Amino acid sequence: VRFSTSHPKDMSDDVLEVMGRYANICNYIHLPVQSGSSSVLDRMNRTYSREWYLNRIAAIRKYMPNCAISSDIIAGFCGETEAEHQETLSLMDEVVYDLNYMFFYSERPGTLAAKKFEDDIPEDVKKRRLEEIIAKQNQHALQRHKEQIGTKQIVLLEYTARRSDQQLVGRTDGNKKVVITKDEWNIGDYVEVEITDCTQVTLFGNVIRKIDL
């Protein structure tokens, strides 16, 4: 079972305790933050602060120590100052996300933000801030993947690699993409894989054995 996404306010200790207790629930949580600045979060009407969000991250680490965490981040929301942008970067350093979905703010007519606030951040500033967020996330993703080298992971093989029909691609229970040599393995197999190499987006490994689940 793979958890999809949750508003941080719904990520209670009770939910995390249950997720950590059952082996058939994946070690992966998508917990959107949007911004690392409490003042920006207030303007977004997100109903939580930076501190409250980080408390939920700490709870995830407590109940699910090996859990991979992803998020959504928006650069250049209405009125965002450079200091508020730096708060987002510092939150990223504190959490060290495995994956992030990153965008710059684009006004949508009819939304609360469009009604209440002016889209006043110049596009070149939005793009520069987004580039800084992406660069930091790329560093963190590579860091998280390097931590996996030498470990053994259970991988569900999902499809043939685009670059070679002699490779298969699967995912760990932490939602990390793993590439293996096809050999006698088939799509749909669960296999134990020793991770040997990585990029910031992909793990590579050798199959040790097939797993029957």
How would you describe each model-predicted region?
Residues 85-95:
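A glycine- and small/hydrophobic-rich beta-loop-beta segment
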Residues 3, 31, 72, 92, ...:
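Conserved, mostly hydrophobic/aromatic
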Residues 113-213:
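Terminal RNA-binding accessory module
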Residues 15-16, 88, 180-181:
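Short beta-alpha junctions and helix-cap segments that line functional grooves
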Residues 19-20, 88, 118-121:
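Short, hinge-like loop/turn segments at secondary-structure boundaries
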Residues 10-14, 33-44, 75-82, 98-124, ...:
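Flexible glycine/acidic-rich beta-alpha junction loops that bind and position SAM and/or redox cofactors
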Residues 1-82, 93:
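Conserved SAM/AdoMet-binding glycine-rich loop
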